[in-house]
Amino acid sequence: MKNIAIITGASSGIGKEFLLNMPKNIEVDEIWAIAREKNFFEGLKEESNLNIRPFSLDLEKETSLMKIKDLLEEEKPNIKLLINAAGFGKFEKSTNISLEDSVGMIKVNDMALTSLCLMAIPYMKKNSNIINIASVAAFQPVPYINVYAASKAYVLSFSRSLGKELSKEGIHVLTVCPFWTKTKFFDRAVEKNKVIKKYVVMYDPTDVVEKAYIDMQKKKSVSVYGFIANVQRVLCKLLPHNFVMSIWCKQQKLK
């Protein structure tokens, strides 16, 4: 039985950093790297000597998820690490975002993530790990990032509950909640009119991933990198959400 890791969103950003910086104590025979982009593997080969098995799959489509399910049933690997880093957002007034994009966010950010967790768990043993990528937006409702923030709140709640359920089996679940991070995420998220205008700080994905792996080894349930991000996390616990939303809208000069 071969040991594998599965990483979605592996072609760029946080997902790619998770792949390239995987701790040496996680010994796997193969990394299943999943990304929507075609031919993304060529770039990864130049940056890594890991045994990467690439899959060009759009996780918004159920057929893509079924391909993974069928492959797991066929090969029956031992999954030592699952990282759900695929996802996208749209920054705009909710009624100005296409229905296709709004539903697509839920399909990729939530449905695909949930499906992959439930598919993978039967092939995981004690000391295996699941890392799900949420966002600091998961801690509060965020106008003009409405569906995205709600989808990440789901990821946080689902992951923490799942971690509790799996703890007796020795399977650990970590939720990573990044603040603004320098990735290609914004190429798709930001519309031409740029509703979101102010980014307090922009973190490097390598730092986010480094802390996440450290927190995984420490068996933490949530990983938040950066002083400002952690301040926001605390304030969202202490302050009424109506007040937090008002501050956000004022900061972005939104009505």
What are these regions (language model features)?
Residues 11-12:
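Conserved glycine-rich cofactor-binding loop
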Residues 23-43:
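Conserved glycine-rich Rossmann-like NAD(P)H-binding loop of the short-chain dehydrogenase/reductase
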Residues 85-90:
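Conserved NAD(P)H cofactor-binding loop of Rossmann-fold oxidoreductase domains
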Residues 93-103:
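Substrate-binding pocket helix/loop in short-chain dehydrogenase/reductase
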Residues 117, 151:
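Active-site helix of classical SDR
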Residues 135:
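Residue(s) in the substrate-gating loop at a strand-loop-helix junction
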Residues 175, 196-233:
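C-terminal helical subdomain
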